[in-house]
Amino acid sequence: MPNKRIFYASHAVSVDGTVVHGAQSVGINTNFNLEQVFQLGRLAIYDNIATDPDVEITINKILDGRPTIWKLATTGGSLVQRANDQSTIVLAVDDETQDFIAAPHTAAITMTGCYISSLNYTFPVDGNLTEEIVFVGSHKAVGGTVGTPNADPLDRVLRRQNVAISECTLPAMVITRKLSQISISADLGREKMFSLGQLAPFHRFVNFPLEITVSFDVISDGENQNILAGPTFNETNVECAGINILKEPIVIKLCDSDGDIAYTFNLGSGCSLQSVSYSGGDTGGGNVTETYTYITYNDLTITG
């Protein structure tokens, strides 16, 4: 009997032959990047040219002790070492009446030569700790196979108690504060390289320097009056006077239920405070939140 719908149990995704365990969502967006050509003497369009078709794949997963999508898709240590790695992404769909996905599939799509375009990690006080990776590529074809996801996580799904605060290296502004969320993000800013004789780009390079952002949401209690709005500064006309924004190390560690470190996010020692925001506390009953956003460049190592 043909499928009437696709829901979470009837589709799955793999990266380089390994099924993504704990995947929460997957989306595919195809853009043919049409360019219009017109001609003198006629109002109607002359031609619609597909200049360089793109496929974008977004995968979101919970962190559960198993390898990150970042690790499945790339090899090496630092961000620079992993920048040119390409992956094969397969999305498979099965019968909606099955308990789990398994080959042979009802349908499948394979996307080869995919590069990581952006990454985002979110560690909230409410909900699960998550990873979201966006891939971009130029090849999409029918077919492919995805393995059956495991029934259980490797340990437990990580939540707020699994942020190992005592093991983290945090900036001075937030080290003693009550944190409600940590977010790490980077847009790799891929640019295409073309050559005569072929439609698809032969390379998508990372446009260094690459900015990495980490933000800390803090529950404001009003006791830290001197840092409520971040470092203070006064407009001055004194020669040679300026604002000294220090560079600080940031390392975020997540632990499993046994207390062992499952994931480490090392942003190096060159993180600088970029902005501070103060919001909330309105008449709707919400609390005031301070957000401290730090930036660094070209330095991000993820293990786990």
Where are each of the predicted segments found?
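Signature of extracytoplasmic/envelope-associated structural regions
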Residues: M1-G304
